[in-house]
């Protein structure tokens, strides 16, 4: 299948293009805001076509799918254009700036009969799938709590709009909290009901938050605590799941690489948990292509993207107001 890229992004260059090509897909054209940017990206990535007019690119009936990795405020319009042109869409998170916009994208894809997926890469990780399996099999009993620690140092080449442009969707909440919301939903199989939160600009953010802590209430009664930041170079990342019969400790697993350690602790002692170390993006592409072929579903579909955005927006509102916020899924939950 021939693909168009909407956005000449770092994630496309470092991960997604290689994953598409590894699956035998043809990355045919890239769109960006300027001809110079699109042309340079195309040259560097060995892509034959480039341009600034997405509608013209979408008019090519030979294009079967679009990967969207532009800045966040562009996702909604670009996805709707691609969907209405009959293309399958893999869209970066957050899907949009509002839950209503994201829900509109999902509804449009359903009406058009195309696959619409959210690129939540962490649920493609072998480590996360192993943790989910342990929980589902009852190895730790009833889940009591989940702790997500995802405070990192944002590399210089990724800062830009993420640390100073609220209009483009900057800030750590749409960048990382949205991922952690998906992780919690994936692992626990339920949607957060309400959240409390506190956020700060702790040295990197200029007009946007660069650090946030939040606690989420789950329907089962489990509690989730999440910590995300752009300003913590030595914190490490990971997750802990604690249950009535055991605990799971997964360290170094909140990354784009298939790395980290997973351990299960029960009354019998501590044991290392093996997991497959496949490429996360290769898995995401494989699941997407299976869905296109009618043989499965994407790793994270559009509804998953709506839900993760809803949680992230509730976290921001809770932090802004200092009050507990119910999560508004816009009818998608």
Where on the chain are the PLM-derived regions?
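Contiguous beta-strand/loop segments that form the cofactor/metal-binding neighborhood of enzyme cores
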Residues: 182-255, 282-295, 330-333
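Predominantly a Rossmann-like dinucleotide-binding segment in NAD(P)-dependent oxidoreductases
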Residues: 122-205, 322
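N-terminal Rossmann-like dinucleotide-binding module
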Residues: 1-45
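Hydrophobic residues in well-ordered beta-strands that form the structural core
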Residues: 12, 51, 91, 116-118, ...
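Active-site loop of classical SDR/Rossmann-like NAD(P)-dependent oxidoreductases
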Residues: 11, 33, 274-286, 300
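C-terminal helix-rich "cap/oligomerization" subdomain common to oxidoreductases
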Residues: 5, 65-68, 290-333
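Beta-loop-alpha module in the N-terminal Rossmann-like domain of NAD(P)-dependent dehydrogenases
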Residues: 45-108
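Rossmann-fold dehydrogenase core element
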Residues: 104-121, 141-146
């Amino acid at each position: 299948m021939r693909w168009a890229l909407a956005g000449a992004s770092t994630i496309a260059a470092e991960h997604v293009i290689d994953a598409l090509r590894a699956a035998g897909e043809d990355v045919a054209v890239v769109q960006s805001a300027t001809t110079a940017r699109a042309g340079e990206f195309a040259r560097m990535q060995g892509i034959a076509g480039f341009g600034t007019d997405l509608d013209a690119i979408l008019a090519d009936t030979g294009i079967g799918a679009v990967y969207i990795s532009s800045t966040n405020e562009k996702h909604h319009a670009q996805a709707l254009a691609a969907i209405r042109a009959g293309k399958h869409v893999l869209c970066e998170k957050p899907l949009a700036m509002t839950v209503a916009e994201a829900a509109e994208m999902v509804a449009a894809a359903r009406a058009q009969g195309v696959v619409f997926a959210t690129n939540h890469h962490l649920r493609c990780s072998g480590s996360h799938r192993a943790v989910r399996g342990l929980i589902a099999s009852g190895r730790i009993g009833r889940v009591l709590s989940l702790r997500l620690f995802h405070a990192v140092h944002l590399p210089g080449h990724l800062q830009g709009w993420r640390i100073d442009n609220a209009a483009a969707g900057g800030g750590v909440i749409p960048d990382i909290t949205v991922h952690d919301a998906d992780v919690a939903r994936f692992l626990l199989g339920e949607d957060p009901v309400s959240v409390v939160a506190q956020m700060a600009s702790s040295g990197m953010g200029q007009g946007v938050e660069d650090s946030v802590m939040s606690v989420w209430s789950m329907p089962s009664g489990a509690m989730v605590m999440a910590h995300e930041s752009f300003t913590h170079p030595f914190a490490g990342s990971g997750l802990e799941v604690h249950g009535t019969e055991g605990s799971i400790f997964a360290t170094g697993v909140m990354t784009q690489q298939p790395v980290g350690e997973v351990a299960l602790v029960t009354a019998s002692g501590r044991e290392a948990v093996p997991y497959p170390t496949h490429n996360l993006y290769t898995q995401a592409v494989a699941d997407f292509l299976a869905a296109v072929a009618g043989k499965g579903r994407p790793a994270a579909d559009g509804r998953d993207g709506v839900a993760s955005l809803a949680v992230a927006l509730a976290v921001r509102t809770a932090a802004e107001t200092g009050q507990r916020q119910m999560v508004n899924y816009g009818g998608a939950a």
